[in-house]
Amino acid sequence: MAIWRGSEPLILASQSRVRQLLLANAGLPFETMPAAIDERAVQRSSGLTTAGEIAVRLACEKAREVSSRSPGRYVIGADQTLECDGRLLNKPAGRADAGAHLRALSGRTHALHAGVAVVRDGRLMFENVSVARMTMRELSEDTIESYLDAAGDAASASVGAYQLEGLGIHLFSRIEGDHFTILGLPLLPLLAYLRSQWLLSL
């Protein structure tokens, strides 16, 4: 039985395979349409400084950009930022940068801020930011190099140089927070919003 009551599928303004998998596993029909925005430019021009504010602003801007090309559709935007000791880390540019990220996070607790937004016809309908706290174990240089060898290009594909759903799980001693937040899409508040709009039958 289909649980979606909308007349058309959702649009996910992201190419993230993990976010796509989360929506698909939740039984939500959707199409993907990547947002054409310069994330660094949005971050610089927004004047925002906290990781949570930046995550939700980027989520909103992604959804707005795609909404401008998708009249009448519910568009989901999502973004994730990482903060460690007051410093924001961006997605690593390559292996050397990923190694630097891991050295900075080694033995410390960092926060992942996941923002999600829903926009329809250019109007912000819903936004949420959730936080998870991640404690990385002390990593030796050998461990970092072994991880980078094993992870390959995946080490540069996310802001923390790890994917918790993959080899990244080996790097942590403690995790506090919602699983979906860690994966970059606060699914529970998103589903609650869709339910409040009578778009879900469950």
Swiss-Prot record:
InterPro entries reported for this sequence: ITPase-like_fam (IPR029001), Maf-like (IPR003697)
Keyword hit for Cytoplasm: yes
GO process annotations (BP): nucleotide metabolic process
Enzyme Commission numbers on file: 3.6.1.9
Swiss-Prot/TrEMBL cofactor(s): a divalent metal cation
GO CC terms: cytoplasm
Compartments where found: Cytoplasm
Catalysis: reaction(s): a ribonucleoside 5'-triphosphate + H2O = a ribonucleoside 5'-phosphate + diphosphate + H(+); a 2'-deoxyribonucleoside 5'-triphosphate + H2O = a 2'-deoxyribonucleoside 5'-phosphate + diphosphate + H(+)
Full protein name: Nucleoside triphosphate pyrophosphatase
